[in-house]
Regions:
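Boundary detector for helix-to-coil junctions that initiate low-complexity/charged tails
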Residues: 1-41
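An N-terminal domain-start capping segment
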Residues: 20-21, 25, 80-88, 92-95, ...
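Generic surface-pattern signal
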Residues: 24-31, 35, 39, 43, ...
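Class I SAM-dependent methyltransferase Rossmann-like catalytic core
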Residues: 39-89
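S-adenosylmethionine/decaboxylated-SAM
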Residues: 52-67, 90-311
């Protein structure tokens, strides 16, 4: 153990950070069991229980090796959903927004197992300049963020994937979404979008949704921001751009259950950090999330009680 340099400052003890890390470590065995439990995993993938445990452990290990904006448990949720897609259904996995490649590393591992390509779209230059009319972009830069922050160089990302993941299944597409996504080609069985802004989410939906296969998955990182996620319930938006009903979003506001302590959508944005959100949300193509029950529009509404019961 190397001796401390004279005069070196000792890092202050942070109890909330310690508790979060301790909880994550101690709950990992149970999380691995429950998150990998699925009777819908196809036998052709050969994912026995020991193999699922090893995959989950690699996700957990990689989470401490490569910086990422999403928890390894969320990555494991995506992996299990991918294993539920029949291997006969052709299509790639697409990641939009990869930062330094933490999620990319883990997604590449499950793509290697399932025999699918992982297509990674990112500017590799950090946050884009704000677009007119984008409230999240305006709020983000008003709070001190700058264009270019959260950027990981292409060489850094590919280096991380080569070291901890499966680089051979990956292709990388450098540029702003509005320039690269219109050129996407091929079916998509699962997409993961960590894109921050309204304008970026719109680019992903407009250019990639038509390529999502029926019953394919779209995962979203910004599930805590309810107005941001409301596009998945907007009848106007989906009718205007896709002529269909909105698909909805499972986990809006709080995320899907991954075993992390969580009480408040705003907790992930600031104090108290001990309650920070560590999850993900998703939708499936073909789902319909539209309200169709308006009892006052029907004469002799079946929801009305019989006259004998009302008197």
């Amino acid at each position: 153990m190397p001796a401390k340099k004279p005069g070196a400052k000792r890092r202050p003890f942070r109890p909330r950070k310690f508790v979060r890390r301790a909880y994550d470590f101690l709950s990992t065995p149970l999380a691995l069991f429950f998150l990998t439990y699925s009777r819908q995993v196809h036998d052709e993938y050969g994912m026995t229980w020991p193999k699922r445990m090893r995959l989950g452990y690699r996700f957990y290990r990689n989470f401490s090796k490569v910086q990422t904006g999403t928890n390894w448990r969320a990555h494991l949720v995506m992996a299990m959903k991918l294993l539920e897609i029949p291997p006969q259904v052709k299509g790639a996995v697409v990641e939009c927004g990869c930062w330094r490649g933490g999620a990319t590393v883990n997604l590449s591992l499950i793509c290697e197992i399932t025999g699918r390509e992982l297509k990674v779209y990112d500017s590799f230059e950090g946050l884009p300049p704000p677009s007119p009319g984008d409230p999240i972009a305006a709020r983000t830069f008003k709070n001190g963020f700058m264009p270019g922050m959260y950027g990981g160089a292409l060489e850094e990302v590919t280096g991380n994937v080569r070291r901890y993941g499966a680089i051979d299944v990956c292709s990388f597409h450098k540029g702003w979404f509005k320039d690269t996504l219109p050129h996407h080609d091929g079916a998509i069985v699962l997409a993961f979008w960590d894109v921050d802004f309204y304008s970026s989410l719109h680019d992903c939906l407009l250019n990639l949704w038509p390529s999502i296969v029926d019953r394919g998955f779209v995962f979203l990182d910004e599930y805590r921001d309810v107005p941001y996620c409301s596009v998945f319930y907007s009848e106007k938006y989906w009718d205007k751009y896709f002529s269909c009903a909105p698909p909805g979003l499972i986990g809006i506001g709080t995320g899907v259950q991954v075993g992390m302590y969580f009480t408040d959508p705003s907790a992930g944005m600031g104090i108290p950090r001990i309650q920070g959100a560590e999850s993900i949300a998703y939708c499936r193509k073909g789902d319909r999330s539209i309200w169709e029950y308006y009892p006052d529009e029907f004469e002799n509404n079946p929801a009305d009680p019989p006259m004998s019961a009302a008197t």
